[in-house]
From Swiss-Prot:
Zn(2+) binds at residues 333, 384, 514. GO terms for molecular function: ATP binding; catalytic activity, acting on a protein; metal ion binding; threonine-tRNA ligase activity; transferase activity; tRNA binding. Residues 1-62 form the TGS domain. This is Threonine--tRNA ligase. CDD domains: TGS_ThrRS, ThrRS_anticodon, ThrRS_core. Homodimer.
Amino acid sequence: MSFSVTLPDGSKKDFDKAVSVKELASSIATSLGKAAVGAKINGEMKPLDYVVDEDVEAAIITDKDEEGLNILRATAAFLLEAIAKRKYPELRLGMHEADEGGFFVDTDKEDQIKITELPELEKEMQKAIKNGEKIEYTSMKKSELEDIFKDDQFKLDLLKDEKDEVAVYKLGDFVDFGFEALLPNTGKIKNFKLLSVAGAYWLGKSSNPMLQRIFGTAFFKKAALDEDLKRRAEIKERDHRTIGRDLDLFFVDPKVGAGLPYWMPKGATIRRVVERYIVDKEVADGYEHVYTPVLMNVDAYKTSGHWAHYRDDMFPPMDMGDGEMLELRPMNCPSHIQIYKHHIRSYRELPIRIAELGMMHRYEKSGALSGLQRVREMTLNDGHTFVALDQIREEFAKVLKLIMDVYKDFDITDYYFRLSYRDPKNTDKYYANDEMWEKSQSMLKAAMDDLGLDYVEAEGEAAFYGPKLDIQTKTALGNDETMSTIQLDFMLPERFGLTYVGQDGEEHRPVMIHRGIVGTMERFIAYLTEIYKGAFPTWLAPVQAEIIPVNEEAHGAYADKVREELAKRGFRAEVDHRNEKLGYKIRESQTQKVPYTLVLGDDEMNANGVNVRRYGTEEQISKSLDDFIAEIDADVKSYSREK
């Protein structure tokens, strides 16, 4: 027997007998053998015990590699499965996964595992880690595994996709499959943490049973684990779902509709302020705001191309019984096209700018839904401008300036520009017109170059009908998210037969510019909630001033008078008339992150004044009511976020 192993640098190692991945790594360098945790053999992940006995390409994976971390986390998931099965013999196991975020294991148990039980599971896992229990890598016939798991429908479902020979791992009597590569023993899983539990439908389908998903993470070094746990704590503190619950901004009840948020009065106030701001900004910039129906004949979406390219993200059409099929709109473009088409248009009218806070519906699977960020019903800050060919660059610059002005008011500074093109290797998902794509992509690029702005280019990120400029922001949780878009569209004007009468008296085809300034209200307010950590700047805060009388009987009426004076001037204030201690009320006002807390006692009432405490400070300052009104008025007009 003789064979060669080709390494990543192109060099080869020759062998005259079979070698394990561990032995292969050691033959390259002793230090590599010690650091190795697995290998990629012909592109597939394999464990250290995997035997090589033929010509292959091999890349050794160490604990410094991202793939190495995934191997560690997969091993932690496997150990969690084994320990959970020892502790709860009746438990059934579903899917498992390890990636850059950590790992998870799906379980099915009549009495669900409580989050308070995770420390006990961790303790049992630590015992196995301390003992360095051996994890055996082998293979078994698919039929053998079907016999072992004959009473476990979850495992039988997973086995359907396996080949006749299945790689399996054993820890004592425990056996499982579906792992690419695991460590040969439990000894290296020292730095891990079980994080949380949540529900997950089997195979991601809402028609299947709901299982319990246990999340965890693991690192080779304790310092890395500590840093990750610190980051997760910060994320939890900023999570808009947590803040939304604590501040009573919104809720979602799966019993009445997953992905359909209910806006509570405070959350609705924030949304209303943002919507009014956006509408005023757009009207001042030359947009005409409209209202259009959320239902549309399905034929419009066949004409637009949504039916062919976007159907999987649309709800099923409604048969009205008379041949009419109505569809909940997934996008507003066809609606604004109808506004344009309602009149004969002249070149003198161009650009025609149409905007709407348009409600849309998109078919999202339940597993993808998340708070306000991924919902099934959303309101998009949408706009479409119809221009002549020679107006594109000027209008593009105008839209971009509007976006930058809005970013300045919300203090959005962490962003970059991305030109999103179609994927030339997968053109089936895009409108088929090579000339149009080349023309629109080059025009978009030229417009950015004219403005002297830096940008990255990304293939495969375009809309199906045209390229776009995406403005990518970093959320408070560190995720990359598209906040704003500007898209050039030559396709829809052609498909809907849009025209305008030119200076020559002939009909011409307009170009359509799609643009979204802040995306959907739902996602934007989720973004703001996390960026501000719930401490909204005064102009956005649902309650701008909390008024607390020291003694209800003595000062309650004066507190109401102060609220009325503030309300007359357009400020949002509440009076806390509850029969609670003063200190408790002040603390709760701070917990609710109200910008101003006004405490009113004898001195304040006699002087027609207020005692003011800003959120996040201990300092209390007495001043006249007029002075406070001037202060809060200047604060609201500043449109600035507290640094």
